[in-house]
């Protein structure tokens, strides 16, 4: 009996040892489990927390009402939707958000379609360069266009230096300087490159044989576009429409900069105001509404794309599309395209740069130009150091590089690990769970996701300390927000590498980490670099995601520019935005160099 028990114990330990050795040799399952645990906490827990906050009594309200902290309540839902202040904090901002989103999306979609058609399909002058130049506004921080507009059209309604037009004796009316009109225009000019890229890509993929056949049967250009090309662009048009609406609804900078002076509130700025007033229950409800709107728009987009997948063109690729000759319209259309570039990309840079180089607005004498706002020497009416010597700017610059850099590296590595687990564990629950949960942050606008993180990490929960006010929280929220892009990139990259190289390494006795570092890492080097640089670019110009999470000492360049604007230091804000623009441009050039392509490759020329 004793021998039998001893033998069974030995066989158990031998079996356990074999399983552990297999797990160490091929720990894909273990990696998948660890990723499931980490992402469950970083993605699902904040969402659960914000839903909980929307129906839980806060400590302050509990003290005022005689209830218990955390007690179930519909108070905040009622406050947002039916109370005496609901018009101010929700219904009017919702109406304003819909109005601005409608006009901004309409302008962006129209500009994107027209310019994409001109660059990809016509002999417009400079089409080779316009393909890249027209997407520059997409690389700039969201507040660049708004601050440039403010610098140009600002009037005496708000304090600070004169606007450029006002310095020439022209006082812009309030409706032109602030409110729905400038917000809609600035949003449209910021987001039309998104439409331009999608339409350009769609147009380049349309089989040219369809147009050739129509031309053979005598169809005119107008008929070809109305009967063939535009119907084929319907899925792209719907995607542009829905995704642009989602982006405009979640944008904070432009409504804050141009809406606050006119007391024109959108949902994003109403959410921010609730955060500043420490009304966490209302914050939770508004954030949930924004998230549900984003989810609804995305589901509609998916439905439209799937529906229109039935209408595909079948056949070989025709000859390369030859640019249509515009004839007498070539010069007018060329002027139009270059004017859009001037207004949307070059214009803001010029306005921002001029404002930082002129000691007095509107004085174009040579003696008025200099680096006073950059050095802080002989600056009229400003008690702040210059950009080069400002402790706030230097700290914000360091924080931006530290936070965006750390987040991008973690995001890139995490994306490849998710890709590895998903591809190497096909058909498993772990694979399906990781694929879906890593995409979940895409459904939430930046402000709403930041509010979710604020609700989760504002206080200590078990072994996890309170992270609010720390750089760690900003890094975490950036990592999780950009994870959908990194994970999709990682999955795509890993699907291109079969298991054979790893199996060969195992035969030669290489351990798991040796196979990762010596086999997979070199094969995925380019994918990893791209997965790091793209989140870094986005992180450097991020504002909506971090504006409610930063505290003194953790300011980024984007939030510091907003602080300067709040205190009336327009020139310092503009200089800070220029620094962001330069860093982003350099990062894009590095990305182009690494990938040996560019964001507008194939669009023209």
For the regions a language model picked out, list residue spans one by one.
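Transmembrane alpha-helical segments of polytopic membrane transport and secretion proteins
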Residues: 1-34, 302-340, 431, 592-605
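Juxtamembrane inter-helical linkers in multi-pass membrane proteins
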Residues: 59-69, 74, 212, 220-223, ...
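Glycine-rich helix-loop "coupling/hinge" segments at transmembrane-helix boundaries
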Residues: 65-66, 154, 252-277, 363-369, ...
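Juxtamembrane helix-boundary/capping and inter-helix hinge elements in multi-pass membrane proteins
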Residues: 122-125, 204-209, 219-222, 260-263, ...
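Alpha-helical residues within the helix-turn-helix
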Residues: 215, 273, 506
């Amino acid at each position: 009996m004793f021998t039998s028990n001893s033998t069974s114990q030995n066989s158990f330990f031998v079996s356990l040892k074999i399983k552990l050795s297999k797990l160490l040799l091929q720990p894909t399952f273990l990696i998948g489990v660890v990723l499931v645990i980490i992402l469950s906490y970083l993605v699902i827990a904040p969402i659960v927390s914000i839903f909980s906050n929307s129906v839980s009594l806060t400590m302050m309200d509990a003290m005022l009402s005689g209830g218990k902290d955390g007690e179930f309540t519909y108070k905040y839902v009622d406050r947002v939707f039916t109370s005496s202040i609901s018009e101010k904090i929700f219904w009017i901002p919702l109406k304003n958000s819909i109005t601005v989103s409608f006009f901004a999306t309409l302008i962006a979609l129209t500009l994107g379609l027209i310019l994409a058609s001109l660059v990809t399909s016509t002999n417009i002058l400079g089409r080779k360069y316009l393909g890249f130049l027209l997407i520059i506004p997409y690389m700039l921080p969201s507040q660049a266009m708004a601050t440039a507009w403010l610098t140009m059209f600002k009037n005496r309604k708000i304090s600070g230096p004169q606007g450029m037009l006002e310095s020439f004796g022209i006082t812009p009316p309030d409706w032109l300087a602030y409110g729905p009109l400038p917000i809609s225009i600035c949003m449209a000019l910021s987001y039309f490159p998104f439409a331009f890229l999608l339409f350009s890509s769609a147009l380049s993929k349309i089989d040219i044989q369809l147009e050739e056949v129509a031309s053979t049967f005598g169809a005119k250009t107008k008929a070809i576009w109305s009967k063939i090309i535009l119907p084929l662009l319907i899925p792209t048009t719907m995607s542009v429409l829905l995704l642009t609406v989602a982006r405009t609804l979640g944008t904070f900078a432009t409504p804050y900069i141009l809406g606050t002076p006119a007391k024109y509130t959108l949902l994003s700025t109403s959410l921010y105001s609730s955060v500043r007033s420490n009304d966490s229950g209302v914050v939770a409800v508004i954030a949930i509404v924004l998230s549900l709107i984003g989810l609804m728009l995305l589901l509609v987009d998916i439905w439209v794309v799937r529906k229109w997948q039935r209408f595909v063109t079948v056949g070989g690729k025709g000859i390369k599309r030859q640019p249509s000759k515009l004839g007498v319209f070539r010069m007018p259309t060329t002027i139009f395209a270059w004017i859009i570039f001037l207004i949307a990309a070059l214009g803001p840079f010029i306005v921002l740069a001029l404002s930082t180089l002129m000691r007095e607005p509107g004085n174009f004498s040579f003696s008025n130009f200099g680096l006073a706002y950059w050095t802080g020497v002989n600056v009229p009416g400003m008690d702040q150091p210059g950009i080069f010597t400002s402790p706030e700017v230097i700290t914000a610059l360091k924080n931006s590089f530290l936070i965006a850099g750390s987040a991008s590296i973690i995001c890139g590595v995490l994306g490849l690990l998710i890709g590895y687990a998903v591809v190497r564990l096909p058909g498993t629950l772990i694979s399906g769970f990781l694929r879906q949960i890593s995409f979940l942050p895409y459904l939430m606008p930046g402000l709403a996701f930041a509010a979710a993180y604020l609700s989760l990490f504002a206080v200590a929960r078990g072994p996890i300390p309170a992270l609010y006010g720390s750089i760690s929280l900003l890094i975490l929220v950036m990592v999780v927000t950009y994870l959908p892009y990194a994970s999709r990139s990682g999955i795509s990259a890993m699907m291109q590498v079969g298991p054979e190289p790893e199996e060969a390494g195992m035969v030669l006795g290489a351990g798991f980490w040796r196979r990762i570092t010596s086999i997979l890492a070199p094969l995925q080097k380019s994918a990893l670099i791209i997965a790091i640089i793209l989140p870094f670019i986005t992180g450097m110009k991020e504002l909506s995601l971090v504006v409610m999470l930063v505290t003194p000492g953790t300011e980024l360049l984007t939030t510091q520019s907003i602080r300067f604007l709040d205190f009336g230091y327009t020139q310092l804000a503009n200089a800070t935005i220029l620094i962001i623009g330069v860093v982003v441009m350099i990062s894009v050039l590095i990305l182009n160099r690494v990938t040996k392509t560019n964001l507008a490759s194939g669009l023209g020329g």
